Every structure is written in structure tokens, then in C-alpha cells.
């Protein structure tokens, strides 16, 4: 069994509890190439765990993994593995993300190696993220050729090399029970024919993305039978104007997961992206995880988006630890090196594991009042066994002077004033409600 399976739109653990992933991204896009070389170590993992997070989306860069056609850089993979071991040693889940932006360095982006960047000599102006997707013909043609599976310089199709890279990563982590799975490509771009995707492009998803994900899943399954694939729509889905056909209906096990990002231009469109994410997951009975959002230092924006996620019971991973939370992991995580305001906004109460189905959770930043409700019926329709507990995370940053807790339908079975509260529902309780207020411990 993997660390997390799924039942409908929910992640579930081996005991059947609903699990809510919540955490951050760490992607080392450029030199010094790995999180380890950039200074990410035990102190960083401890900071995340101590503030209530349980998941990290960790970048794997194909250009570093396969710097030459067919050659896996095992030193790079060894370094990624050491970082995974640090994270899992702090009981953090890890999602391995094959990351790119703007295709690769040869087109002024990051991710893909130069040998896999086939632009057919089109103009390559130095446009900046994210406008380079629509302003740089070389980026568009590089994606066209990747989706067409053109042969690389050695005559081997590009996606075959890419699948070899995915297989090497999956083989390395096939038995790691804290790895959540593999995301084949961050924010894929449709290529030259991108305009239909502004309002949703099901035909292009079926033509380009579905075969790609099937090919990557086959590569993973050749060495790893337990970890799911995280399927992400084309990047224009992020703006909330169109739907996705992903991940699609399936009876396969493990079930593919829907990975989405929320980067719309208004609060209403952010809500639209979230609602479309939930609707797609519920339609296909697949788990959903918002694997990126944020990329800002404004606590008010972070809190507004976090409130919107809570309203929809959506799990999330903030972008990004190494851009918005910590400035330099080679230095002590104190003072100006730590963005306390961002960390304060992110470290919110939430249920990390629910012995039943969560039906509501919220946190009022002004009053520091948190409310949480859940049903004691599981996603599979069966009653949750009382032997298991529900876990409520109450970070010290949210309650620096402690907290008081009122509960209807359950009892606290953990130590008083703990930051991680364990609840056991009462014998006849069909629903549990929790209200947390500041002060009291």
C-alpha cells in the first residue's frame, strides 16, 4: 500500500481515514541544482513539521536528471533521495514533481535539457515568465515537437527519453511509503495552438496530454505498482476560465490524482479554478490536490486564498518555500532570513486526518477562532471505527497564548494543550463539531 490511497475526491490512509495534505513546494530550478546543494537540510524539514505542515512537493528537473540523451545522472538522483529521506524522517509526505517553466534554459526557461529542445530555428526572444509562453515562438515549437514525440539527436523519441527519466525516479522510490506519487510535468503548455485552452481545450487534452500521461504511467508501472500519477491540465486552467477532462474515469489502482494550480487574476476567478478542480475530481471520483498557489509575500492575499481553500475543503501546497518563506537555506532560519509574516499566514489550523468525512473547516484570522465539523461516516459509506482518531493541527503560530477547545460528539484523547490534537468520536455520534478559541492553555 502507498502512504495514501483515495476514495472519491479524498485522500485516504491505510486505515481508511481521510488525509488532508498541506505544505509547500521546494524546486531548485538552477545551479546549484539540488535542494541539498542549496542548503535544504534537517532544520528546514523540522521548521515545516513544527509548523504543522505534512507535505512537500519536491522538484525533479529533467535537464539535471538526464543531461545527455539516455544518461541518468545518478549523483543528482542520489542527492534528491537524500532530501526525500530528510523529509520523510520528519514524517512529511513527498510529491515528486518533474518541473519545467518555459520549456528549458535554451528558451529562457527551466527544466528541459538543450538536447531535447527542438525549436526548428524559430525566433527565441528573451521574453519573461509567464508572457514568454505567448511571445516566444521557440517555446511554442519546442512543446509542439515534444507532444509530437519527435526524435532527439540520437534518434530516440523525446517522450521515450522522458519516460526513461521517470522510470529511473520511480525505481528509486518504489518502496518509499512516504512518497505520494509522481507528477510527470509541471504546468504543461499546449504549444503553438494554445488559444483554445483559454476557455478549456478538451480535444487538445485528449490529443496531447492523455497519451503523454499514459506513456509516463506505463514507465512508472514497469517498476512501481503502488504510487499514483498526478495529472495536471494545461497551464491556462490556472486562470479559472475553462474545465479539464483530466484525470478521466478509471478503474485502475492506484487511481490517478488530479493536480491543479490556482493563479487567477481575481478572487472570483481563483474561486472558479478551485470549483472546477473539485468538480472534475468528483466527476471522475479521483483525489484532487492543489499543488501550487501563492507565489506572493502579502499575508492578506495568502489568508484570502487559504480561506477559499478551506471553504472547499481543498488540500494545498504553497509556492514556494525557497522563494517566499526562507530566503537562503544555507543560513540559520532566523531573523531576516525567515519571512515570518508569510509563515504566520500559512500556519493555520486544519484537520490533517479525519476518521470520517470533513464537512467544514474555517479559521478567522482576526479572532483566531477555528471551527471544524466532520461526519463519522467514511467516504466508502461505512461507519468509522472508534478505535481510530481524528487529528487536528493547531499550530503555535495561530495560538501563541494557547487555546480553548469546545467539542460536541467527540473527546480529546491527546495531551492537554498539544499542537496536534487527537479526537475520538463518541459511540452514538454521527457528526462531530469543534470550536477552538485563543487562550486557555
Task: Give names to the regions the model predicted.
Residues 46-52, 171-177, 246-257, 277-285, ...:
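Acidic (Asp/Glu)-rich catalytic clusters
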Residues 337-415:
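Surface beta-strand/loop "capping" patches
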Residues 348-357, 361, 417-441:
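C-terminal beta-strand-rich structural cap/linker in extracellular carbohydrate-active enzymes
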Residues 22, 235, 263, 267-351:
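Substrate-binding cleft of secreted/luminal carbohydrate-active enzymes
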Residues 95, 230, 257-259, 289, ...:
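Structural detector of well-ordered beta-strand residues that form the stable sheet scaffold
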Residues 180, 186, 232-233, 244-269:
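Aromatic- and acid-rich polysaccharide-binding/catalytic face
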Residues 8-13, 330-333, 405:
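Short polybasic amphipathic segments
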Residues 3-21, 25-228, 233-245:
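Active-site mouth of glycoside hydrolases
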Amino acid at each position: 500500500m502507498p502512504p495514501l490511497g483515495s476514495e472519491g475526491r479524498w485522500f485516504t490512509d491505510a486505515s481508511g481515514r481521510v488525509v488532508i495534505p498541506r505544505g509547500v513546494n521546494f524546486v531548485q530550478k538552477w545551479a546549484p541544482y539540488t535542494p541539498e546543494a542549496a542548503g535544504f537540510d534537517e532544520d528546514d524539514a523540522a521548521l515545516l513539521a513544527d509548523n504543522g505542515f505534512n507535505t512537500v512537493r519536491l522538484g525533479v528537473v529533467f535537464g539535471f536528471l538526464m543531461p545527455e540523451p539516455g544518461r541518468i545522472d545518478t549523483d543528482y538522483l542520489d542527492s534528491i533521495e537524500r532530501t526525500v529521506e530528510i523529509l520523510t524522517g520528519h514524517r512529511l509526505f513527498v510529491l515528486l514533481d518533474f518541473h519545467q517553466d518555459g520549456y528549458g534554459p535554451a528558451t529562457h526557461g527551466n527544466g528541459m535539457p538543450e538536447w531535447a529542445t527542438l525549436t526548428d530555428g524559430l525566433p527565441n526572444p528573451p521574453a519573461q515568465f509567464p508572457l514568454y509562453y505567448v511571445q516566444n515562438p521557440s517555446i511554442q515549437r519546442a512543446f509542439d515537437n515534444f507532444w509530437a514525440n519527435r526524435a532527439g539527436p540520437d534518434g530516440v523519441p523525446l517522450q521515450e527519453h522522458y519516460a526513461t527519466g521517470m522510470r529511473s525516479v520511480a525505481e528509486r522510490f518504489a518502496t518509499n511509503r512516504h512518497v505520494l506519487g509522481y507528477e510527470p510535468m509541471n504546468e504543461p503548455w499546449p504549444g503553438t495552438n494554445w488559444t483554445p485552452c483559454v476557455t478549456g481545450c478538451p480535444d487538445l487534452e485528449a490529443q496531447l496530454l492523455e497519451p503523454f500521461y499514459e506513456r509516463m504511467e506505463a514507465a512508472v508501472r514497469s517498476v512501481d505498482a503502488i504510487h499514483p500519477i498526478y495529472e495536471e491540465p494545461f497551464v491556462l486552467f490556472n486562470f479559472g476560465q475553462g474545465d479539464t477532462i483530466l484525470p478521466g474515469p478509471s478503474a485502475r489502482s492506484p487511481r490517478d490524482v488530479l493536480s491543479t494550480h490556482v493563479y487567477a487574476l481575481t478572487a472570483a476567478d481563483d474561486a472558479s479554478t478551485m470549483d472546477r478542480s473539485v468538480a472534475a475530481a468528483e466527476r471522475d471520483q479521483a483525489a484532487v490536490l492543489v499543488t501550487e498557489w501563492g507565489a506572493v509575500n502579502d499575508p492578506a492575499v495568502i489568508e484570502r486564498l487559504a480561506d477559499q481553500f478551506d471553504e472547499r475543503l481543498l488540500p494545498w501546497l504553497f509556492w514556494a518555500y525557497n522563494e517566499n518563506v526562507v530566503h537562503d537555506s544555507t543560513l540559520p532560519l532566523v531573523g531576516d532570513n525567515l519571512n515570518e509574516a508569510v509563515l504566520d499566514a500559512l500556519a493555520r489550523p486544519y484537520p490533517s486526518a479525519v476518521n470520517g468525512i470533513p464537512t467544514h473547516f474555517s479559521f478567522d484570522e482576526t479572532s483566531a477562532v477555528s471551527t471544524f465539523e466532520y461526519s463519522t461516516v467514511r467516504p466508502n459509506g461505512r461507519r468509522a471505527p472508534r478505535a481510530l482518531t481524528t487529528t487536528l493541527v493547531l499550530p503555535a503560530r495561530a495560538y501563541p497564548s494557547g487555546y480553548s477547545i469546545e467539542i460536541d460528539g467527540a473527546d480529546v484523547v491527546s495531551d492537554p494543550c498539544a499542537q496536534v490534537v487527537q479526537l475520538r468520536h463518541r459511540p452514538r455520534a454521527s457528526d462531530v463539531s469543534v470550536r477552538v478559541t485563543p487562550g486557555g492553555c
